[in-house]
């Protein structure tokens, strides 16, 4: 079971969630938490279990085992009504006008008609949809339909946001607008859980990241924590060295070679000065530096050859 700090009671907790479809374990003891005011990036390959986990959170599918809690209490229908959800399969009424659709959805979440209109107009303006407010959704571009879907997840001022690929189909300007909105919501204390294949964006935006592979969580933490767990990596440029000079160095693994620069991961306890000495033995060394792996590199290390 998850151990939740008393100061983090306002957290969305996914605790030991399991879900099988026949012989396939879509979720296998999935556990993590999204703290109040936190942007949590949920990443993994296609079919890794991201969407199933989110569906369990929202009650779209029932877990076979495990529990989801908000603020320490198991979720029920009334609690989930206060969540904002962007599903993988977008669900808009194609012939309804944008404004009418958002007002209707806000009212479904308990807003009065005037409050619903104000909220709908606000999100229409913030997401750049003013010129489309009276248009039918089916007449919008896919990118603008995505903006409407995002407005639908935000219009009722949700306590928790669960967004499945929210940046999919957005142009760069819209990505920046949404990123600012998510930061603002997190700044107001809302836990924000979202999935994305855009790992550079996740690294830039998120407080913490969870990596899922074949239904199991394989890594979770801040990017710096994931870096610390990946060990020390150095980059060496020894232009006079023969190809493969580093292949036999004890306690090291060659993880990349680019333009003569060799990237080496050092095992625990290996002194980087021993690596430098080995490089100097081949001739002049023009570069010797520690490498900070990107989230893309950390992701590849975490999932290996899997998906």
Feature map (PLM): residue ranges:
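A short, local hydrophobic-aromatic micro-motif
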Residues: 15, 64, 138, 253-255, ...
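ABC transporter nucleotide-binding domains
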Residues: 12, 19-213, 219
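C-terminal coupling/interaction segments
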Residues: 267-307
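Conserved N-terminal strand/loop that marks the beginning of ABC ATPase nucleotide-binding domains
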Residues: 1-17
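ABC transporter nucleotide-binding domain
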Residues: 179-267
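Structural motif
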Residues: 90, 250-253, 283
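Short, flexible helix/strand-to-coil boundary loops that buttress conserved ligand/catalytic motifs
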Residues: 79, 227-230, 299-302
């Amino acid at each position: 079971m998850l151990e939740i700090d008393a100061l983090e009671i306002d957290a969305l907790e996914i605790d030991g969630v399991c879900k099988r479809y026949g012989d396939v374990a879509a979720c296998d003891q999935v556990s993590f938490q999204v703290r109040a005011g936190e942007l949590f990036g949920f990443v993994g390959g296609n079919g890794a279990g991201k969407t199933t986990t989110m569906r369990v959170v929202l009650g779209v599918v029932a877990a076979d085992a495990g529990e989801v809690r908000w603020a320490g209490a198991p979720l029920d229908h009334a609690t989930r009504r206060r969540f904002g959800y962007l599903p993988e399969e977008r669900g808009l009424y194609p012939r309804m006008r944008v404004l009418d659709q958002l007002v209707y959805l806000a009212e479904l979440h308990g807003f009065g008609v005037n409050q619903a209109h104000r909220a709908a107009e606000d999100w229409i303006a913030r997401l750049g949809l003013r010129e489309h407010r009276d248009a039918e959704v089916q007449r919008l571009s896919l990118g603008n339909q995505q903006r409407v879907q995002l407005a639908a997840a935000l219009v009722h001022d949700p306590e928790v946001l669960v967004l499945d690929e929210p940046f999919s189909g957005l142009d760069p300007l819209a990505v920046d607008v949404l990123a600012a909105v998510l930061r603002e919501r997190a700044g107001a204390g809302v836990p924000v859980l979202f999935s994305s294949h855009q790992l550079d964006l996740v690294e830039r935006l998120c407080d913490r990241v969870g990596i899922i592979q074949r239904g199991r969580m394989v890594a979770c933490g801040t990017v710096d924590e994931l870096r610390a767990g990946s060990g020390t990596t150095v980059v060496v440029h020894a232009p006079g060295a023969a190809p493969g000079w580093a292949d036999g160095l004890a306690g090291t693994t060659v993880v990349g070679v680019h333009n003569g620069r060799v990237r080496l991961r050092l095992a625990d306890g290996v002194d980087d000065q021993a690596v430098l000495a080995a490089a100097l033995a081949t001739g002049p060394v023009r570069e010797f530096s520690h490498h900070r792996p990107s989230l893309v590199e950390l992701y590849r290390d975490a999932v290996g050859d899997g998906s």
